[in-house]
Amino acid sequence: MALKVKFFRDAAEIYAKGATGVAEGGHGFAAATMHAAGIDLRACLDEPEVIVGPGDRVCTPAGVAIEIGAAGVAGFVFSRSGLGAKDGLTVAQGVGVIDPDYRGEIKVWLLNTSHWEQKIVRGQRIAQLVLLPFFQANAAPCAELGDTDRGAGGFGHTGKM
């Protein structure tokens, strides 16, 4: 699938420097391996580092804007498993959504869920961008919904005996 990428500031250098196997003049904005589901997003900070206090959030520029070349596909920004498990830094809203018609710079809100200050350094891998299909609903108002065995039970209801 075609994916156009626009780099901001010196982001092309940051991505090329952090990637492996990038040819001279290459940009490095690609999946790390042939079977990787996502593309790592990097902290394209103006300063060398940012400190995130316990429970605090920080908006981190990823230095790129994208244009997805397929209809019905959007970008989803997920936490990196190691960053969340080791440092407690996760995508603040759970998952970020990059609508296919959005053309601005991708920014990642990171939340420090740990009890200690965490440091984000320039060029660090902070999240991953995964392209996935989506469906738009054609909502139809109604007075009643169809019956199911579950009904309106929620919040752990299906696990009860």
Q: Which stretches of residues belong to each language-model region?
A:
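Non-catalytic terminal segments and appended small domains
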Residues: 1-161
